[in-house]
Amino acid sequence: MTGWSRRRLLRTALSTALVPATAALSSASPALAATGEWRFRRGVNAWPWFALTREFPAPRTDYDWPPFQSQRPVPTPDDLRRLRRTGLDFVRLPVDPGPFLAADAATRAKLLAMLDDAVAAVIDADLGIIVNVQANGATHYWNPDRMVSSTAAPEFEAYRALVGTLAGRLQRFPSVALEPVNEPPQSCSSNVWSNVQAALLAAARASSQTLPLVVTGGCGSMVSGLAALDPEPLAAFEPILFTFHFYEPYLFSHQGAPWMREPVYRALNNVPWPASAGSLERTLASVRARMAGDTETSEADKQAAYAETERVLKVYFDARPDRWFVDKYIGQARDWADSHGIAPTRVIMGEFGALRTDARYVAAPNPDRARYIADVRQSAEASGFPWAFWDLFDGMGMMDDKTRSLDPAMVDALGLRMPE
C-alpha cells in the first residue's frame, strides 16, 4: 500500500466513498477459463522487509549501504513458521526497486542474493510467496512517476529490465509468483497503463515462460480498476493471476493515518464499524479532542479541516455502511471474473486492512477494526477470492514489531488460529 497512488485517488474518494462504481463487462474468454493449481489462499503482506530505505538527499540518486533501515521489523524464520501454523499459506513481499536500480553491478548482485534468501526462507516455512515490485512514492528520485507513469518515463526501461531479471531468478523457486507493479496510478481504463503492464509482462516472459505473473487494473488496483480491465490481451502472458486491493470506505480504514496528505484523515478517529455501532456526534467529539491537542496546525486550517470532516462524516453515517457495503464492492470483482470466465481462485485481494489505535496511532477503535477485517475477509471468501492482509507489522499489522506476539483479535478476524 503506497500512499502516492492512493492519495491521488482519495481526492475524490472522500465524496464518493459510499457509491460503488459500475462497469460494463464483456463476454467470457475461453482462453482465460483455466483454473490451475495455485498455492495462494490466505496470505499476509511482509512490508517493510525490503522497504524503508536510506536514500541520500538530492541531487544524489543512490542509497547508503545497506539500503534498508536496520531498525525495520523483518520476520525471522521462527516468525514465518508461526505464521504458517496460524493457517496462512503465503506471503506477499513488497520490494522497493530503488536500491536495486541505483546500485552498481556488484551491489545489485548482493541485493538480489538478499532477496533470494528471503524467498527461500518463506518457502522453507512451507509458505508460498508473491514478490511485488512496489515503488515508493516518498522517494525523491526512484519513485513511481519516474518509473511506471508511462513507457516513456525516464527510468521505465531500467524498471522493465529489473522485472525481467527478477522473473529469471524467481523461476527456479516453487510456489512463487511475480507482481510487477503495485497500485498503478493511471485511470481505470487508461491505455497508458495497459501499455506499461504489457511491456512489463513481456519482459518477465522473456526470462521465464512458466513463472506465474500477477496482473491488475488501473485506479490504484481498486475494484473499479479491475472491473475496467480487459483480460483478453493478457492471455498471451499465461500463466497469470489477477489482483485488486480493498480499503473502502477509506474514512474507516485510513482514519488517523499520519501519512495521508488530506487534512481530514489526520485528526479523524473513533469512526465506528459498522456505522450503526456509533454516532456522528461521538465521532465529531473525538475529532475535536484530537484537533485540540494539535499544536502544529493553524486554527484556520483546523477549522477548514473540521468543516470538511463534518461533511464527509455526515455522508458516512447517513449511508450506514455495514457488511452489505463490502459485499457490493467485492461482488463487482466477482461479476467481472464470472463475465470473463475467470475462476475466482485466480483473483487475489492482494491488500486489505485498517489502521489500529495504539501507542503510536489514534485511529479506529480496535473492536471496530476487528469487525471490519472480519467482514472484508468473509466477503472475499464468499466470492471465492484468495486474500493477503495488510500488514504483518506496524499500525496495520497482526504481529508486534518488538515482542513478535500475534494479535489474537486479528488472528480471529482473519479466521486463523493462534499457533501453539
Regions found by a protein language model. Name each.
Residues 141-156, 257-268, 404-405:
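Aromatic- and acidic-residue-enriched segments that line the glycan-binding/catalytic groove
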Residues 157-322, 331-355, 382-383:
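Active-site region of glycoside hydrolase catalytic domains
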Residues 359-420:
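Aromatic-rich peripheral "rim/lid" segments of glycoside hydrolase catalytic domains that contact
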